[in-house]
Amino acid sequence: MKKIRPLTEADVTAESAFFMQRRQVLKALGISAAALSLPSTAQADLFSWFKGNDRPKAPAGKPLEFSQPAAWRSDLALTPEDKVTGYNNFYEFGLDKADPAANAGSLKTEPWTLKISGEVAKPFTLDYDDLTHRFPLEERIYRMRCVEAWSMVVPWIGFPLYKLLAQAQPTSHAKYVAFETLYAPDDMPGQKDRFIGGGLKYPYVEGLRLDEAMHPLTLMTVGVYGKALPPQNGAPIRLIVPWKYGFKGIKSIVSIKLTRERPLTTWNLSAPNEYGFYANVNPHVDHPRWSQATERFIGSGGILDVQRQPTLLFNGYANEVASLYRGLNLRENF
């Protein structure tokens, strides 16, 4: 694998600006004239987000022990921590960007079990302590690109998914990996009320091809900014696939199952013409209702400082992952 261009702290997205909202099958958030093509709820979110003082405070996570390998450092500017943890898409806790931080305190993460099953020789289950102690943790500074055409740079902490899968020993029949979020309607109000949860079918499910899951960039993430993930960011463990749109990054995972057939995925089930299975970041393949050619980078500034920049193919990781899709029509397999 070619060496990944380092990101710098200047490129990391502040914690509080992390997630922007889609209502139902939401439209991308825009500014000025571009915003006219987007939903009023998304427009309102953008301006309310940058008011400043009324943003919800992220709960403090416990400090984690981790290494900082040189290969994963970067000169990119980080998104501030309060934006990453205060601006989220996690419909199980509501549709507004501030809802997850305000409502996710009800999520119980201890005890926790993560089951690895399916087409494996050695199925097993991880408990809460295993998530942060079974595999060495490392910090990786990754670009993060939302399908809504905004982006961040985030210092995630976790371990490569391939290490977990290697212990399970996939069989020759394993072709895909299916992921499932916790189903706990009493703790996750969006699962109980279709209005709160955007009308999606729960629990949230996602999937990858096995070769995508085994790629060194694919990260099982347990922390951010040096601390354990807060609930609104997908505690206690979530998936990060940096060359794909953010909705592939399933949160609060309780099941990883290796399968022979391609698994169903939540947003693809909800709107298959808008959200594909692959969801690779691609400036040449627009969403049916907005362009993906550019993105708004959310950094440390306010609304007048939001930077619009070109979208990078595979979110800037083409050298590392383009070979996975050799011969695949990326327009048809979006």
Swiss-Prot record:
Record's keyword annotation contains Oxidoreductase: yes
Main location class: periplasm
PTM section of the record: Predicted to be exported by the Tat system. The position of the signal peptide cleavage has not been experimentally proven.
Reaction(s) catalysed by this chain's protein: L-methionyl-[protein] + a quinone + H2O = L-methionyl-(S)-S-oxide-[protein] + a quinol; L-methionyl-[protein] + a quinone + H2O = L-methionyl-(R)-S-oxide-[protein] + a quinol
UniProt key word Transmembrane: no
Subcellular location: Periplasm
Keyword entries, A-Z: Metal-binding, Molybdenum, Oxidoreductase, Periplasm, Signal
GO MF term list: metal ion binding; molybdopterin cofactor binding; oxidoreductase activity, acting on a sulfur group of donors, quinone or similar compound as acceptor
UniProt-listed Enzyme Commission number(s): 1.8.5.-
CC cofactor note: Binds 1 Mo-molybdopterin (Mo-MPT) cofactor per subunit.
Residues making up the signal peptide according to the UniProt record: 1-44
Binding site for Mo-molybdopterin: N88, Y91, E92, C146, T181, N233, R238, G249, I250, K251
GO cellular component: periplasmic space
InterPro entries with a match to the protein in the record: MsrP, OxRdtase_Mopterin-bd_dom, OxRdtase_Mopterin-bd_sf, TAT_signal
GO biological process, one term: protein repair
Listed Pfam families: Oxidored_molyb
The protein's required cofactors: Mo-molybdopterin
NCBIfam families xrefs: PRK05363.1
Quaternary structure note: Heterodimer of a catalytic subunit (MsrP) and a heme-binding subunit (MsrQ).
Protein name: Protein-methionine-sulfoxide reductase catalytic subunit MsrP
Gene: msrP
